[in-house]
């Protein structure tokens, strides 16, 4: 539905027995297949951003499925990527980063098994609230060149589609 974050949710929907009601999920607006189509069939994802592909082409079977679902992939919009959500923000180490609230660099990001970061040209991993540790590295960006850094609070807010005028108070870990 256009959010630059992979989120899995469970919905419980109920109605009183005396009410004649029907419910269905909203019609999807975006799809992973449409993003893959733009990356690997037309190349428009990379071209529109002035980039060379930063990921491996999917295996032949996956590519065939993407091509065979062409009609569906043209109807739905591509998933919004982490890159798309933060592309107009400067690197948090650049002096111009101070122009954006809560856009402060945090040192120390590093990958280890099971702690891999979010791929820049995919939607972000689900960001979790709280100071419970970060087992999957979802608060890190995995750059195509093999480097990593933590998302700033502002970048995390962008991924969750908070407006830029929202001010977050407290320590970075809160």
Model-derived segments and their meaning:
Residues 80-174:
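C-terminal target-recognition/interaction regions appended to catalytic cores
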């Amino acid at each position: 539905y256009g959010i630059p974050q992979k989120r899995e949710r469970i919905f419980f929907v109920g109605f009183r027995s005396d009410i004649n009601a029907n419910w269905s999920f909203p019609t999807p607006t975006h799809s992973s297949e449409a993003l893959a189509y733009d990356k690997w069939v037309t190349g428009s994802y990379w071209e529109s951003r002035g980039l060379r592909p930063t990921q491996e082409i999917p295996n032949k079977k996956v590519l065939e499925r993407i091509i065979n679902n062409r009609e569906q992939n043209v109807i739905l919009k591509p998933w919004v990527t982490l890159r798309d959500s933060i592309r107009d923000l400067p690197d948090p180490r650049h002096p111009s980063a101070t122009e954006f609230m809560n856009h402060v660099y945090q040192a120390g990001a590093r990958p280890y098994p099971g702690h891999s970061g979010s791929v820049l040209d995919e939607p972000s991993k689900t960001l979790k609230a709280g100071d419970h540790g970060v087992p999957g590295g979802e608060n890190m960006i995995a750059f195509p060149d093999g480097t990593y850094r933590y998302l700033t609070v502002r970048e995390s807010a962008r991924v969750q589609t908070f407006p830029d005028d929202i001010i977050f108070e407290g320590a970075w870990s809160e």
